[in-house]
Amino acid sequence: CAKHSETCKNGNCCTCTQYRGKDEPMACRRGTHGQRCQCVMKIMKH
């Protein structure tokens, strides 16, 4: 599957840990470099 910030197509994104602790597929968003997988409400690790 495609990781965060990698090019995505046909919903091939990896899952991403959400703030509620559930794993959900990343959203495929169109950006300046084409469509990329993006975690929505990704848990930030410092």
Curated annotation (Swiss-Prot):
GO terms for cellular component: extracellular region. GO terms for molecular function: toxin activity. Keywords: Disulfide bond, Neurotoxin, Secreted, Toxin. Signal peptide: none annotated. Expressed by the venom gland. It is found in: Secreted. Contains 4 disulfide bonds. Potent toxin that may paralyze and/or kill insect pests such as H.virescens (lepidoptera), S.exigua (beet armyworm) and M.sexta (tobacco hornworm). This is U2-plectoxin-Pt1a.
